[in-house]
Amino acid sequence: MSKTVTAQLPEIRDELAAFYKDLHRNPELSLQETRTAGLLSKRLREAGFDEVAEGIGVTGVVGVLRNGEGPVVMLRADFDALPVEEKTGLPYASQVRGVDHEGRDVPVMHACGHDMHAACLTGAAMLLARSRDQWRGTLLVVFQPAEELAVGARGMVDDGLFERFPEPEIVLGQHVGPLPAGVIGYGTGPVMAAADSLDLTLHGRGAHGSRPEASIDPVLMAANVVTRLQGIVAREVPPAETAVVTVGRLQAGTKDNIIPDKAELGINVRTFTPAIRDKVRDAIERIATAEAQASGAAEPPEFAWTGAAPALVSDPEATQATVAAFAEHFGQQRIMTMPQVNASEDVGVFGEVLGVPTVFWFWGGLDTETVLGALKEDRLDELPSNHSPHFAPVVEPTLSTGVEALVVAALTWLADA
């Protein structure tokens, strides 16, 4: 059945490629994706969806296609961009600038492939709408904003996504990455890490740089905390478990001869299980609190945890059924297993709040010959990957593979006509 549906892809391939390039040329930051949302909703209406709604979770788009009795299946794609200056040199490269959520003027680029995600889901929605004689059930298409801030999925849920629209029995999604174009990679169980961000403020007492004895130096406190945090993964997390603690930002003071009264650290945590997640978070707070006490700080540290996303769990049974359909459609030679990925995705929120399975897979966007050449020369780490200013998937076969994968996955769970 999937071959019958995807046989129509050549009829819309050029249109989709142009749409993808337009999205790439005109990226929008998280929760500012108004132009993109308007284009996506227009496409769904033109495809004949029964319901199309914008503004779900600020800028999210939802489409409902009812086609008789049968399962409710959800296809999801994100569509926000990043504050990155594009360096791909493509004729459709972004030259856009924007204002980020902290009020800074920044360059904007689709450096994570969300434009490809959105174009592929648009294509899959068009093909499934054209082929209603092939399946039965309800298709729920969700274009999610603000994945890069890890707040988009929760925002849509909190805005009544599953009260206003049919509750799906399964959630399906995908992510393009630095694999050979046309290849599909998958894992089962926890496939992407939980993410937590912490803004930590250490309070001290300021003084002139010539009189350190009059201070409680928050810079020294911060340095000790940064060093001590490295012991969490090395000495508190079991070797068989995976965790990452990264200090990506340390800010203190304005002048070399002034000891400031506070230091701020931006900390990122990645884990795969709730138990390790709690252990690492508790250890960070314990270490910072102990350092402040040891330094004689009058105020305890401030902890502001933000941007939390749960570990993404691809349901083992549902994933195996979907991958079997991929193998039948694409051929086993285009399917590969993947290790766990320490990056994070908030798509898991949807299935988690409903208690239904999520199936998530990856597909390649890099030129195959380029990947093989890098592999031969042991240069794989030099290839542009997600969030790189040089990352841009080759349009084909990336686009066609992404569209077909979504169609195949949806038809695996929708009822036969």
Regions from the PLM with identified roles:
Residues M74-R76, E85, L198-L200, W361-G364:
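Non-cysteine beta-strand/loop elements that form the S-adenosyl-L-methionine
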Residues L23, G63, L75, H114, ...:
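Divalent metal-coordination and catalytic microenvironments
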Residues V61, L82-V84, G89-M109, D115-M116, ...:
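Histidine/acidic-residue-rich, glycine-tolerant segments that coordinate divalent metal ions
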Residues S2-H110, D115, A119-G123, L127-R136:
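Acidic/His- and Gly-rich active-site-bordering loop/insert found
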Residues L220-A417:
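Metal-dependent amide/peptide-bond hydrolase catalytic core
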Residues I12-F19, Q32-L40, P71, V108, ...:
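General structural feature for long, well-ordered alpha-helical segments within catalytic domains
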Residues V73, V142, I170-L172, P357-W361:
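Hydrophobic/aromatic beta-strand patches that form the interior of the parallel beta-sheet core
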